[in-house]
Amino acid sequence: MSLLSRGLPICTALAMILGGSAAFAETALIGGVSQKDFKGATGAPAGGSASPLYFANNVYSGETVATPDAGATRLTFQDLTELHLGSNSTVVLDHFIYDPTTRTGDAAISFSKGIFRFVTGDIQNKSNVKLTTPTTSLTIRGTNFKLIVNDAGTIVEVKEGHVEIKPCGGTAETRLVSPGEAVQVTASCNVKSIALGDVPTDPGTDAGGPRDGSPGHEPHAPPGRSGANG
């Protein structure tokens, strides 16, 4: 039985699975894989080699998570924030710190390439969650949004809440993206609105919905890199 299925409080479950693997002994446990179906995702510690990421495996600060073509995974962090990765996507989990007592924390995630959905959890000071792509810095305000990172730049499509985008390290004007809007920051730092129909889709980010109770999408605390597949 996994710690997840025991229904333990987040802080208790995390404390019990801190043993982890030796490769991650010097890094902080920040969450785990919450997608039941394995679709090729891998995780690699900073400076280390990649290994498969199965359901209920831990993820750690500094870890690079990647998916192959037609791959997908979903990560759940300490405050129940969800990060969905679609096909051929890579992200670096710089850090994610959360205090469940005060419901405050600090996080940084770097999106290298691919298609993602990000759904905020219980963390209250959401402005401390720093998300970056090669062309954009993003500040979230209670949000559910899709993010596409490719050679053409970055696309942000907001479903709920708001996302403030700062193109190219602040060299261009900051823009607030609202629900029902999609904005692209091009590789040359130009900012433009785009039609929702022009936003790429992917089964890993568009099938079902976050926390919708569909198979493999149950809400739960972060699991651990342990058990039969660990």
Model regions and ranges:
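Bacterial N-terminal signal peptides that target proteins for export
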Residues: 1-11
